[in-house]
Amino acid sequence: MKQIRIFGLAASFVLCVLLLTAGCTKPAGKPAQTKVEPQEQKIPVKLALKFTPADSTTYKVTTDTDNSVIWESADPDKPKDFRGGHTGRKIETTFTQQIQSTDDKGNAVAKITIKQLKYLAKVKNDVTMDFDSSRQQDGQNPLSKLIGQSYTVQITSSGQVSKLIDANDARATVAGDSAASKTAANLLSLEVITERHTIPALPASDKNQVHTGESWSSIKSFSFTMMGAKAYEKIYTLEEIKDVGGRRIAIARMEAVPSAENARELHKEQSAAFLANMSDNTQTYTGELKLDLTGGKVEEYRENLTTEWLIVDPNPKNSTQPAALKMTAVRSYSIEKID
């Protein structure tokens, strides 16, 4: 009975801590590196962005962060205050990117103007914020002030945001004390802007000449609060080059594997995550890049991480269906060219 109570307390603890946080992502400072594999001699292609002054392109970026907890049995000993569900946020931002200038290294200064925004936040399945700039009734929401606002960034040919040049006017416009105003301000933070405009699939600029069949990689780490931290090596492989409407489209696919990168720091966080040590863990982390080699623009990039933990009562009262908690974390990012 004592062990059942401990399991119940663990379930309640998970809900209080895990679900009230969306987790965070820490991109490693190490740039993507190309791994050259033996193969037939072919002409390599340059996997890089190209920028032209005055050129304007519209993109849609979607990020999704979700944590969920589900009680996996009908065990009558389930804590009375247990309430599973999903906690997280999904953000969809449509913006124009107008190139203002370029330099001899291939970097560009780009003016970003927000055109549309959708923002959905949940806590244990309860919607805490739901905004859609296309809905007339949302016109008075402080988040609507973001529409039409601009900021300026420097972007490298390898798809990295090297500098946030100016976002002062946009930040001043959305300033306020309400929850929606603070959310709007957060969407203009350096961290969120960097994530929004970074193309994580491209190799480093000095290793961007790639043959079909070759691979390159980068490291990305995630913190899952009470479930600890994990690092992954994202391995990209250039699968093929297609001719589409007079354009050459490079297609690369990503498969990620657990990495020992930053092992010491990750071990400290993992050691404190006692719930993770009680669970079985499964995970999938995949992605796909479509890069227009002719125009030097990303057609589409998507990546999705899904990781699950299953904690089973080691001494179940009902041997045929032991009490269990299933916790799932989803982290996804996508960018697609609209026009």
Positions of predicted regions on the chain:
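C-terminal motif of bacterial Sec signal peptides marking the signal peptidase cleavage site
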Residues: 20-23
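Bacterial N-terminal signal peptides that target proteins for export
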Residues: 1-13
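Signature of exported/secreted
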Residues: 25-339
